[in-house]
């Protein structure tokens, strides 16, 4: 899998669809819209454009220290996977604030972690790449962030 690299880009040079995607995410996060359909309608963006960019564009504060980020994982259901995952997160300097794990179905489980990045020793893209490389991790994404 190709390693991801993150860039800091001024808002005024982003394509309009990316800026509107950020607006949609903000509306949903702040509960100013009850659904993606409602939010994209408010900012005049197609749903397909939103889904194209939603996992690729983040506000700068998502990457800043002293934040809380929420990570979503789709994992193989094997003994020790959560423990190993938490070890990698802890080694990065993050403090785990909450853990939610679903009951495994068909050999798969979903885990949501909220972590404080205040003491983080490395940047977020390095941590995300380490997590993606774990053999039992099928998917990892940043769901949201906040102070």
Curated annotation (Swiss-Prot):
InterPro entries from the entry?
ACT-like_dom_sf, ACT_dom, UPF0735_ACT_dom-cont
Report the Gene3D superfamilies cross-referenced here.
3.30.70.260
* Domain ACT positions: 70-145
The cross-references to Pfam families, in alphabetical order and at most eight, read: ACT
Task: State the HAMAP family in the record.
Answer: UPF0735
Task: Give the UniProt family note.
Answer: Belongs to the UPF0735 family.
Name this protein carries in UniProt: UPF0735 ACT domain-containing protein BLi02918/BL01157
């Amino acid at each position: 899998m190709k390693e991801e690299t993150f860039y800091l880009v001024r808002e005024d040079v982003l394509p309009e669809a990316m800026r509107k995607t950020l607006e949609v995410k903000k509306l949903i996060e702040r509960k100013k819209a009850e659904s993606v359909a409602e939010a994209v309608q408010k900012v005049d963006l197609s749903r397909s454009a939103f889904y194209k960019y939603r996992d690729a564009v983040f506000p700068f504060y998502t990457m800043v220290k002293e934040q809380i980020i929420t990570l979503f994982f789709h994992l193989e259901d094997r003994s020790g996977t959560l423990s190993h995952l938490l070890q990698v997160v802890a080694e990065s300097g993050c403090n785990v604030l909450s853990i939610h794990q679903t009951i495994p179905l068909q050999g798969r489980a979903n885990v949501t972690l909220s972590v404080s990045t205040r003491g983080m020793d490395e940047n977020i893209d390095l941590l995300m790449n380490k997590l993606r490389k774990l053999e039992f991790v099928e998917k990892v994404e940043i769901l949201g962030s906040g102070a």
